Amino acid sequence: MSDDHGHMMLVGSVARPEDGWNVEDVMRNAANAIGEHASMLPDGEIGDRYYWINYVARRTYAEHPDMKTLSHHTIDDWKPKGYDDHWLFTIADGVKEIAFDKIGYAGEAKKSYAIFKRLRDEGVIGQGVRFMVAIPLIESATRPFIDTTEHFEMLWRAYGNAIRREVKDICDSIPHEDLAIQWDICVEVAALEGLEGFTSDLSYLESDPMKRYCDALKWVCEPIPEGPWLGLHICYGSLSHEEGQGSDSGHFHEITDLNVSVDMANEGVKACGRSVQFIQVSVQFSNGFDEAYYKPLERLDVGDAHTYLGLIHLQDGVDGALKRMAIAGKYLSDFGIS
């Protein structure tokens, strides 16, 4: 049985920039709303991290002397319009290898953990609740931003090396019994779904997207000892979601069923090289009452990892979530919701 018995999970981002919340605001509100039902809480990925991988583009790639900006989105506060509006970089002529001193996730995690610990000591956050740190997996943080296959491979190695150091720093700085690390897996999903632009000839990297995804997980999990929880968030995106539209509007691709998510969960857990405590998979609102959508859960094989299903949608709230839970429960007996 997994150590994680949470009934509810916040995947990462919580507050919109216009809410004006800081880390403490996020944690106080989250603890008040779902604290007794959640086994871990994030810091809300506020500020630049709200725009997910664009945080890496703005803070790391755009400032690197060997990377040249070809284009970037034009919306204020660096918010992209959609999946075709990312920054785009190239690597300078003659450069064969690049390196990053840091990406920034370790520094953000350590600052947020200090607030988490204070709030827990004050009784705002319950004892035993863990602090969750969400980090983009390698392909998600690199492929949308780079101009050629050769440069993608160079950037893949550079980000991977840097993020391995950062997760080690996080594990060295935060008590293991207080920590949960989640890999955010999105572009890897797009590659497996066969989306245009995500299949190409590769020389250094494994060309099969599932093998490449598993190779990445094995590599970045090596610095994470047993003790901290480890989780996989298998994501179809929310970047293009607009207020007033359904939650499906944010997905880069319609999720017709959970086959790809189950495949990635099963293979990912085996690849990590250590125990995995939780898995989170997205649920398409438009297909959420279709029993066939959930049937792949029958072959979910993730050992003791606790599974969270993205069954909560703004369109129909609690009533809709309960109906989707009942359908999903026919194919998976034990799960939390997100």
Where are these regions (language model features)?
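A structural motif corresponding to the C-terminal end of an alpha-helix
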Residues: 115-128, 166-179, 215-230, 267-277, ...
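Catalytic-face loop-and-helix region of soluble metabolic enzyme cores
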Residues: 266-338
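Long, well-ordered mid-to-C-terminal structural blocks that present hydrophobic/aromatic surfaces
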Residues: 213-286
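Active-site-proximal, glycine-rich beta->alpha crossover segments in alpha/beta enzymes
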Residues: 79-175, 181-213
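Well-ordered, non-membrane alpha-helical segments in soluble/globular domains
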Residues: 20-27, 103-119, 152-166, 203-220, ...
